């Protein structure tokens, strides 16, 4: 049975909101880009969604305090990587210390010099076409321009603060 609660204290509602979304499994992606100074930036996203097939559009959400935020302007490009369980370490790395995200040999320079993460299920080069700030966050809309498929793998999901793969019903 669902429990319904309305609280006078907004921090309690915030905690209920967070708990509800922890129960919502989401696919895991990594977004990489280049900052205005040419240095790489990236982050893990669980908000990736397709928006349209014609033209091919996708969306993701991000915090405006993200190290990649300065690159989110119309006309700039990003590479969106979809992940499987064997590439879970990329999700963890891109969600951790930003100074270590591009330390190592887990990526190569891709189109326009943007990092392409190795061993992902797919990657898509996209151009930022719209950015919609919402409070301290933003919805970013991109148009897919190119991409490639990697080796098949199951989906990587994030659920209850844990990375996992789907199981059959």
PLM region spans:
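Basic, polyanion-binding surface patches
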Residues: 1-169
């Amino acid at each position: 049975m669902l429990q319904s609660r309305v609280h006078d204290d907004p921090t309690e509602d915030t905690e209920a909101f967070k708990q509800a979304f922890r129960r919502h499994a989401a696919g895991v992606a990594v977004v990489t880009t280049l900052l205005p100074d040419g240095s790489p930036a990236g982050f893990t996203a669980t908000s990736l969604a397709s928006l349209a097939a014609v033209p091919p559009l996708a969306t993701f959400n991000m915090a405006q305090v993200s190290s990649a935020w300065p690159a989110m302007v119309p006309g700039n490009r990003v590479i969106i990587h979809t992940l499987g369980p064997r590439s879970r370490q990329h999700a963890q790395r891109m969600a951790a210390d930003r100074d270590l995200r591009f330390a190592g040999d887990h990526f190569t320079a891709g189109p326009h010099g943007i990092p392409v993460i190795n061993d992902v299920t797919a990657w898509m080069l996209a151009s930022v076409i719209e950015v919609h700030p919402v409070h301290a966050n933003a919805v970013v809309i991109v148009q897919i321009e190119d991409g490639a498929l990697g080796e098949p793998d199951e989906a990587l999901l994030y659920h209850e603060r844990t990375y996992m793969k789907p199981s059959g019903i």
